[in-house]
Amino acid sequence: MAVEENNMPVVSQQPQAGEDVISSLSKDSHLSAQSQKYSNDELKAGESGSEGSQSVPIEIPKKPMSEYVTVSLLCLCVAFGGFMFGWDTGTISGFVVQTDFLRRFGMKHKDGTHYLSNVRTGLIVAIFNIGCAFGGIILSKGGDMYGRKKGLSIVVSVYIVGIIIQIASINKWYQYFIGRIISGLGVGGIAVLCPMLISEIAPKHLRGTLVSCYQLMITAGIFLGYCTNYGTKSYSNSVQWRVPLGLCFAWSLFMIGALTLVPESPRYLCEVNKVEDAKRSIAKSNKVSPEDPAVQAELDLIMAGIEAEKLAGNASWGELFSTKTKVFQRLLMGVFVQMFQQLTGNNYFFYYGTVIFKSVGLDDSFETSIVIGVVNFASTFFSLWTVENLGHRKCLLLGAATMMACMVIYASVGVTRLYPHGKSQPSSKGAGNCMIVFTCFYIFCYATTWAPVAWVITAESFPLRVKSKCMALASASNWVWGFLIAFFTPFITSAINFYYGYVFMGCLVAMFFYVFFFVPETKGLSLEEIQELWEEGVLPWKSEGWIPSSRRGNNYDLEDLQHDDKPWYKAMLE
């Protein structure tokens, strides 16, 4: 524990232990002599000072937001990977009802019309998620082997191969199916490496907002995908679906080109002993000189964490299940948060929005999909404020509660009012409009809470040595549940129709309680401070009162944050 207690460059707790660690690290670490001297001087001052005195850590000062335009744009370039995921979500919902797509990859009714069976629809839509799950686990390793930037370029190239196979499909649905698996492999790697790189290059006070830009790009992709489908639906040939797929080449080339401008992760650079490059990366992200003492302090903080992890040996898959280091608890949290993001029911609307709104009697369901896309995209801008100002826990709790209310109304109207004279008769236009309105409310609540925060939590919760593995498994949970929902939704809605909304309502109730008891607040903490929060065993519902060891006073009561004698229901009411 001595090493981890001194992850901060300046430590005012347990001075003797801190001095021993700095001494041991200095033998063959990259901690600067200046920072080692500074740390020892501070420790001695802490020993000789009066009771109640504490040292002040060197931190990179916050600047006006105008100073962070460059790093924000660079993070947006990385976040553009989410656009490719969103583009697929937005376009595939239209493909499955387009005439040329049905003629080429569907089956024929006796009357000569073409259709996709529920099984084939589910497979074509959902298999992408299975590819993503494996891509996140397998291809994300490139981020550890070659660096985050090169790793991203590799997975984008895999995505391009999948798109080529899909475009080349003529009338064999299984060829298109294989292409979706391969493009899914690429997007799965993107979904791990993009949030990871953003979380490692962003200033800590902007990390939540900038990681949320990944979700912003997903929503932009969904919206523009809907718009493109609307623009091509009037064609009668393969332009309907090949043009949207062809545009994927432009997005991929832009992504690869933009990555050349982005700084590499300083944590990765430190891990491969490129310390000077890491210093320049930190300085570029924070708009300060590489010679600034605060940059060196940040570098030393990262190096101390890496040195401690090296002492523990190489990370293995088995270590992910260690309860001693709290990695397993964090992995479970990441898996559950990503699973619950899917069980909110968002992809019920995004994947099958065109089909759903056709069933409520709308003449042009493509137009309604565009409305949903606009609401989703615009709402995500608001999420950039909510993530940092409300905090991560409050966002998740508030989102679960409000989405539950919207889903109850949506399902209840669909079950009781949509077909007042039976399904053989026309649907009620008023009930259909009501369902669309509450669908938009639901999407607003989702886009401002669970959509971005799930990725933020996954990107910042794991130690560096096991980060890619943990993020891959957590993301795989998202993709697997996305597959299950996308594949089984046609069957479930055929059997129970809008009662399906009550299933998601139950999931939203469960996730509210899960977040309250198992997800701590990490807003405004550095990645190393989040590590300390977990190691100290702070109760999630008390985590907002936790202060890192480097900033505590002598009267700080840590034990009160680690225990709670009140019944659970009283803890929730406080």
From Swiss-Prot:
GO terms for cellular component: cell periphery; plasma membrane. PROSITE patterns: MFS, SUGAR_TRANSPORT_2. InterPro entries: MFS_dom, MFS_sugar_transport-like, MFS_Sugar_Transporters, MFS_trans_sf, Sugar/inositol_transpt, Sugar_transporter_CS. It comes from the Eukaryota. Residues 1-57 are annotated as: Disordered. The chain crosses the membrane at residues 71-91, 122-142, 150-170, 176-196, 208-228, 243-263, 343-362, 367-387, 395-415, 436-456, 473-493, 500-520. One of its GO terms (molecular function) is galactose transmembrane transporter activity. The modification Phosphoserine is found at residues 32, 35, 39, 48, 50, 53, 55. GO terms for biological process: carbohydrate transport; galactose metabolic process; galactose transmembrane transport. SUPFAM superfamilies: MFS general substrate transporter. Residues 1-70, 143-149, 197-207, 264-342, 388-394, 457-472, 521-574 are cytoplasmic. Residues 92-121, 171-175, 229-242, 363-366, 416-435, 494-499 are extracellular. Pfam families: Sugar_tr. Keywords: Membrane, Phosphoprotein, Sugar transport, Transmembrane, Transmembrane helix, Transport. It is found in: Membrane. It is a multi-pass membrane protein. The keyword Phosphoprotein applies. Residues 23-38 have a biased composition (Polar residues). PANTHER family: GALACTOSE TRANSPORTER-RELATED, PLASTIDIC GLUCOSE TRANSPORTER 4. NCBIfam families: SP. GAL2 is a facilitated diffusion transporter required for both the high-affinity galactokinase-dependent and low-affinity galactokinase-independent galactose transport processes. Belongs to the major facilitator superfamily. Sugar transporter (TC 2.A.1.1) family. This is Galactose transporter. It comes from Saccharomyces cerevisiae (strain ATCC 204508 / S288c).
